[in-house]
Swiss-Prot record:
<keyword id="KW-0539">Nucleus</keyword>
<dbReference type="GO" id="GO:0006301">
    <property type="term" value="P:postreplication repair"/>
</dbReference>
<dbReference type="GO" id="GO:0000725">
    <property type="term" value="P:recombinational repair"/>
</dbReference>
<keyword id="KW-0234">DNA repair</keyword>
<dbReference type="GO" id="GO:0005694">
    <property type="term" value="C:chromosome"/>
</dbReference>
<comment type="function">
    <text>Promotes DNA damage repair through both homologous recombination repair (HRR) and post-replication repair (PRR) mechanisms. Enhances the retention of DNA damage response protein RAD18 at sites of DNA damage. This allows for HRR via association of RAD18 with RAD51C and for PRR via RAD18-mediated promotion of PCNA monoubiquitination.</text>
</comment>
<comment type="subunit">
    <text>Interacts with DNA damage response proteins ATR, H2AX, PCNA, RAD18 and RAD51C. Forms a complex with H2AX and RAD18 following DDUP phosphorylation.</text>
</comment>
<protein>
    <recommendedName>
        <fullName>DNA damage up-regulated protein</fullName>
    </recommendedName>
</protein>
<feature type="region of interest" description="Disordered">
    <location>
        <begin position="147"/>
        <end position="166"/>
    </location>
</feature>
<keyword id="KW-0227">DNA damage</keyword>
<keyword id="KW-0597">Phosphoprotein</keyword>
<keyword id="KW-0158">Chromosome</keyword>
<dbReference type="GO" id="GO:0005634">
    <property type="term" value="C:nucleus"/>
</dbReference>
Amino acid sequence: MWLVECTGRDLTGLSCLLSMDRQPRRRQHVAGCRDVPPPLPQGSWGQTSPRHSILCSKSGCDLLGGGEYNGETSGEEFLAPAWTCRAQQAATWLSVQQTSHKALGPAGGAAMSSKLSPEEQFLSRIHFLRTFMCSVAGAELPGIPQATENGEGCRPARDPASSPSSLSMASVYTQCSSAQLVSALS
C-alpha cells in the first residue's frame, strides 16, 4: 500500500486531498505531496508513532495512521480509520477556542489554543476536511473497533440516518466519553 504524505502544516498544504485521482492505480501528483512507501521515514511531520503520522491516502480518507486501504480485497476504495479520543478532544478544543475568542477576545482564544500541542492544533483544523472528503468520495467506512489506542472511553459513533455515500461527522468519528471531554477541558 502506497500513501501520500502531506508535507504542508495547514489546510493549503493538504491540497493533495482535493486533487487525488480516486481511480485505482492512478494518482495525481500535486504540490505539497509526495508518494512514500510504508514504513514512513523517521522524522516525517507529526510522526510520534506510526499511528499518529499525518497522512492522506488516495481516497482522501486516511489522515491519521491506522487506516487501511481495502481496495485489493473489495474492489472498492475505502478505509478503516482508527481514530483516537485525542483527535476528538482536539476538535472539541477548537470549538471552545473559537467560542472563547468571540466571548473573551483574542487573549481568551489564545489561552485556550495554547493548551493544545502543535499536532492537536493541526488535527483540530483538518477534522472537518476529512469529513468533507470522505463524503465527496462516497467512501463507505466499515465499523470502527471498540478498542482504540488510549484503551478506554471510546466508542464508535454511527449515524443510522446517514447513507454510505453521505457520511455525517457522527458516522465518521470515534467520540470521547463525557468524562474524558470534561477532563480535556479542565
